[in-house]
Amino acid sequence: MTEKRKKIEPVKADLSPTDLIEPEKKHKQLTWSPFMAVGFVLVLYILTQVVAGILISIYPAFQHWTNDQTTEWLNSSVGAQFGYMVLVEAATLGGLWWFLRRHKSNFRALGLTRRPKLLDPLLSAGGFGVYFVVYIILVMVMSWLVPSLNVNQEQDVGFSSATGLIALSMTFISLVILPPITEEILMRGFLFGSLRRKLPFLVAAVLTSAIFASGHLTGGAKGSPLLWIAFIDTFILSIVLCYLREKTGRLWAGIGLHMIKNGVAFVSLFLLHVH
């Protein structure tokens, strides 16, 4: 007797790996609720800055500096600002690691499941092009609709006294390396992934982007009004980052795009001195 061979249907070649995975299944390892994720991100954002501020203030306390001396050191010292940034990013990742461990999860569930591939830098560059074009168009439209919008308002990124190789290197790490990694893991990996588990892509992306952009509203000089131009900028950036996270299932392309964006700002502000 001869056995009947089962007919094997070939997989369609025009499908990408992520097309074979439903969005809900991409984020099935995230067992906590979207509401819990939003609350945790907001608390973590505030708490890490408080903890970093306390820790960085230990050095002036040992030096027996006055409040004015401490404030001057924190505002003008590149080393102090670098140390503060390192503490904030470390506390953020540490807090997120604690949360994931309590829920029997890990960073792989947030999109860190493989090494970057050659396609990722291309997606990053393409994403930057999309972000830049949309940003220019939207700013033109918003300037026409809202004439009072201050498109020239500057964001205070710190490190104003950075000169020389060592100081510029610390500034580069603080602005171009650390925030893209930490913010993508927290915002697009954790927050967007948590929201996407229950919500459609557009709703999850808009909510994530609104929360992310709100953190940049108060980034101006002390006493300056809210930075609505920075809100628009980072909101558009986040939408593109969420799209990359959705389509690739991972964070590498988004991290690359975020680094390109911050890298352009670094070159403009600290090397070309364009304000």
Language-model region placement:
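Short alpha-helical transmembrane interface motifs in multi-pass membrane proteins
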Residues: 76-81, 88-92, 119, 123, ...
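Alpha-helical transmembrane segments of multi-pass membrane proteins
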Residues: 36, 40, 115-131, 179, ...
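N-terminal, membrane-interfacial amphipathic/helix-forming hydrophobic leader that caps
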Residues: 1-114, 118-119, 143-144, 263-275
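Hydrophobic alpha-helical transmembrane segments of polytopic
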Residues: 41, 88, 127-128, 208
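Cytoplasmic juxtamembrane regions at transmembrane-helix boundaries
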Residues: 102-122, 190-208
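Generic preference for well-ordered secondary structure
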Residues: 22-23, 31, 70-74, 94-96, ...
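Transmembrane helix-loop-helix hairpins at the membrane interface
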Residues: 46, 132-136, 140, 144-145, ...
